[in-house]
Structures are given as C-alpha cells and as structure tokens.
Amino acid sequence: MATQTKRAVTGAMETLDFDKLSDVPVAQFTQKMQGQIAGVQVNQGTGVPGQGMNVRIRGAASLSTGSNPLYVVDGFPIVGDINDINPNEIESMTILKDAAATSLYGSRAAFGVVLIQTKGAKAGKTNISFNAYMGVQNVPQKGRPEMMNGTEWAQFKKESYEDLGQSVPTAFQNPSQYGKGHDWYAAMLRSAMIQDYNVSVSTGKDKFTSSFVLGYFNQDGVLLNSDYQRISARANSTYRISDNLKLAFNLAPTYSFENRPSSDGAFFSGGGLLANATLTPPILDYRNEDGTYPVVVTTPGVTAFETPNWVRSIQDIVNKREAKRLLANASLQYEPLKGLVLKTSLNGDIGSNYQHNFQPSTAGRAFAAAPSAIAANLYEANNRYWSWLSETTANYSKEIGNHTLTVAWIYYTKIS
C-alpha cells in the first residue's frame, strides 16, 4: 500500500481517538462512531445483541449497488464481517471521505475508507490495565405499543358482536371478569444483562515492543432466548533488528456465539414471533397453573382455530451461530537510505461460520391449526473461508523546498 502524510492528503479525513471514548461501553466498534464524525451516518439496523451498525460515509443515495465503506485494519483490507473486532483493541480510527480514499485504495474505496489502527506498546513503558462494565438493558415503556388489557379486549369483542346485530357469546357478556388479563408483548421481553471485561498488557523496550489485549463480552437480549458472546485476543509485537530493519507480527483470534429466535418479520409470518404475540387476546394465559407452557391457546367464544403459544415458541426455537476467526499479519520493513522504505507483508484472514436452526412442532404460525407432531424443521450449515494477501511496496519521499516528491511502487497478490 502506498502511504501519504496527513498534511499531504487534500481530501476530507477525520481521526477518532478511542482512548477518549474508553468509558463508552459498546459491543461493536462502529457504535463509538455515532455522533463523533461530521458527515458520517451510523444507524442501528436491528436491536439483536451483537449486531453491527450501518455506516454510510457518502450517504445512502448511490447509483451503484452497496454502500459500505472499506475497512482496513493495520494496513490489511477486511472484506468479511468486521463486527468481530473488539473495540478495546483499537487505538485510533481515521475516516477517508472522498478522493483521498480512492487515490490510496482504488475502486474498493468508492464509499470511503475506515482505517483502523490497533493498540501497540510505546517504547520504554510497561502497562497493565483491567476494565470491567456491567449493566442492565430494558425496553422503555415509552417505546412499547399500548396494549388492551383483558377487560378492554373483551368489551371490544362484545361491542363488535352488538354492532353486527349478532348475539354475544357467553364468554364476552361480562368483560370485567377478565380484569387486567395478560400482556403477551411484555411476556416476550426481559431485563437483559450486559457485561464487558478487558485486560491489556503492553511492554516496550529499545528494540522490542509488544501489546496484548484479552476481552470477554456477553450481552443478553431483551427478547427471550437471545444473547451474544465474544471472546477475543490480540497480540501485536515489533522487533527492531537494527536501526533500519524492523519485523512485526499481529495475531488476533476471535470466537463469537449468538442465539436469536426469528423475532423480526411481518404479521402472520413464522418469523414475526414478537409481532404475532401482540395479536394474541389478553384474556388468554400463556402459562398453565402448574407453571408449564401450553403448546396452543384457544380463544373462548370463537370457533375457528388454535393459536401457537408464542411465549413457548420463542423459547423452544433454536437459532444459533458460532463464528471463529483469525486475523494474522507479518511484515518486514527495511530503510536502506533516508526517504526510501521497502516493505513486504503477508496477511491472512481465516474463519468459519456454523449455523444451527431448529424449529420444533410446538412453534407455528399465527392463526394456524394445531402443530403436527412431525412438523419440526432442522437446518445446519458450516461455511469456511480464507483469504491471503501478499504485498510488497517501495516508497520514496523527499522534500525539495516547499514541495514533497513521493514515488511509490506496489505489488500485491490476493488468494481467496
């Protein structure tokens, strides 16, 4: 990759110092960008634990498909998921917004570039730090739909029969008998814990510096049976063999696990569990007297169908994903003379994604018939990927008066 000094870049660029945002507890590093950089839109697409943010550097309007920026971690362009990176591993982030991006990275940077510099040790210093965060998340009452209670819903049904000139079923002749009833929407939610622990160790000597970060993040979802966990580590080491020869290694393994039932989707769909729960009459109880959950519930006075118990369905459905990833980098840099820098590097991105989805017969669709004993569905997939990038560069820079002459030669090979 060719290099340019910050003052030589004529385009728009912003640098975000993560040390100043160390007290902001987030699951994904992109969340720290919210409200920090002018002209960069950072939006949350879903409330599922562990899900990343949508980042738009040049806005959403484009004639081309896709609008995600290019992420470059320690000089290595990342093509896949970038949400596995622990925010506590990052030292700084620089956003290239316009022509500066394409001049360095070509067409891959059509929607901007996010340059990520991970933490490294400073010479002459040894530091050990530990930080922890614990919190509780809830869906605020202001953000919840206003649901009818049992009496209100039964009164509504009674009046609907009367308006149609039909006889009112016995079940709805005395609406007050149902009292408050049961809030199915609230039954699908919970108070969710969030925990974040990180240990950092860095040491710096004259010819050797190293930095190690170990992190554990655990976030329960406010929706039942949803959670996200991530275990990450990063080791950055630099060896100065001589005054003009430097060797560097970066190693970053990550393991993440998430479980999320199909909570999104339209009304009446098998995926919209939460939406379907809002349609369930509040006069029905989602729990038996002995504490167990019935498979289906039936509305009294209505001869039509049985409805699945959504509170049970969301706990019975299994939809989990396990991801393993290793980012590795090794580089050798040589400066034979002042202004001339020769560098060769090998970068690797290796990982796997395992998905397991099981929908038992106890989970069904809105207004569907009672589930069949053989109506279960199972889906499994295991995808592996790898990407190698070998890059050799030669950069020569010389200041002549008020001008700077820069010449760059780049050769790279990518295999994936």
Protein language model annotation of sequence segments:
Residues 340:
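An active-site-proximal structural segment forming one wall of the substrate-binding cleft
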